[in-house]
Amino acid sequence: MNFEVILKEKYLENPCSFQPIALWKAIKMTSGFIKETKAVDNEVVNLIIENELMLHTYWLDSKYSIHPKVKDSYTMMILHDNFIEKFDVSNFSDEKYFKLIHNLKNVDKVELNNKFSFRTVNIQSELGLVSDIICKCYSDIRVTPEEVLDWTKEAVFDNSLWVLVVDNIKEMPIALGIAECDKDIMEGSLEWIQVLPEYRNYGIGVSLVNYLLWLLKERANFATVSGRVDNNTNPERLYRKCRFQGNDIWHILRKNSDEY
């Protein structure tokens, strides 16, 4: 069977425990990687995506016990919480991420204070605005207008899913939400939910997420979102307020520099 077909089937069985990010992004990221499967009685029980430096995907059917070997050449591994104990990760730093899912069947009503309003990003003229909002919301992330333009060239791009929240009095955008929709497997994903620091704790983030979910409800069968567990803004709490569910934890493991 074609590897990508197997990948999609396994992903749709449980999107949050099979990949830490949306499937389309994982497929793009691993173009050129080595892809392997092991089967028992024509049933896939083990799946690996790797290259010389990185173990991107490791999945094992819970009915089987296979003990993998960490290659000395790995400088990075991505492992679900279910599998991390199978690996010796003593020489790796560990950054934890959550991944949650929404069934899009029970989307809460959008409640936004009348001081604010939603509008769609103008892709022709507001790439700089998009990058500026993102940069103002992070101390460790810098996104250029050129990078934002590249996002619009992906097959999952849908301009109607790029949404700004505007302060009606100041007539200025104060929050940004970007979602994507993979029509191949009917997956929606939230990629950027950013509220300027001075406008946080007013419920704007919840309103923005619910607004995007209502848009995705007409396009997708489910929606996913990922984020860092130790983020000071606690995005997981925001998404759970909007009925995202799940308990999947992913580990982004990077080999300590003195071990290279």
What spans do the regions from the language model cover?
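Acyl-donor-binding surface of acyltransferase catalytic domains
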Residues: 44-115, 251-255
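Conserved GNAT acetyl-CoA-binding A-motif
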Residues: 71-81, 216-228
